From Swiss-Prot:
Pfam families: MoaC (PF01967). It catalyses: (8S)-3',8-cyclo-7,8-dihydroguanosine 5'-triphosphate = cyclic pyranopterin phosphate + diphosphate. This is Probable cyclic pyranopterin monophosphate synthase. It comes from the Archaea. InterPro entries: Mo_CF_biosynth-C_arc (IPR023047), MoaC (IPR023045), MoaC_sf (IPR036522), MoCo_biosynth_MoaA/MoaC (IPR050105), Mopterin_CF_biosynth-C_dom (IPR002820). Homohexamer; trimer of dimers. The active site is at D125. It is an enzyme of class 4 (lyase).
Length: 156
């Protein structure tokens, strides 16, 4: 079993990466939000009351990637070289993909996971009025399957 790198006998710590080489890093995370089919159609048609759902989710996700070390206390601030957030539509879901790139001493998986999570949360926020049932609940809406699907260390 591997040891935890952020915890030792003295408590919690930020891992020392000063000795590591600067290399290309990439992480891709995906996740889905389940929505009513009618909500998906409203988003595609650009007819939601709060505005362009996809553009807002992209901007929020990119901002979240940049803010990751402020949200997750033991993450290193990383000089990012690029972030892409894309979406694929299904009949009752939107799948978000967040790709993060950097040249640095440590990986960018947490940044990719944070970006995809906030992008999906932003979609929820922008469509919650049409997703609620008559009791103000969200019986169908859910965020699921957030995961890292690719990690690259080394050559681009």
């Amino acid at each position: 079993m591997k040891d935890l790198t952020h915890v030792d006998e003295k408590g919690v710590k930020m891992v020392e990466v000063g000795h590591k080489d600067v290399v290309f890093r990439k992480a891709v995370a995906k996740g889905r939000i389940r929505l009513k089919p009618e909500t998906i159609e409203l988003i595609k048609a650009g007819k939601t009351k709060k505005g362009n759902v996809i553009a807002a989710a992209q901007i929020a996700g990119i901002l979240a990637v940049k803010k990751t070390p402020e949200l997750i206390p033991l993450c290193h601030p990383i000089p990012l070289t690029g972030v892409d957030i894309t979406f694929e539509f299904g009949d009752d879901y939107i799948e978000a993909t967040c790709e993060v790139r950097a040249y640095y001493k440590t990986g960018v998986e947490m940044e990719a996971l944070t970006g995809v999570s906030v992008a999906l949360l932003t979609i929820w926020d922008m469509v919650k009025a049409v997703e609620k049932d008559e009791n103000g609940q969200y019986p169908f809406t859910r965020i699921e399957d957030i995961r890292v699907v690719e990690k690259v260390k080394g050559e681009e």
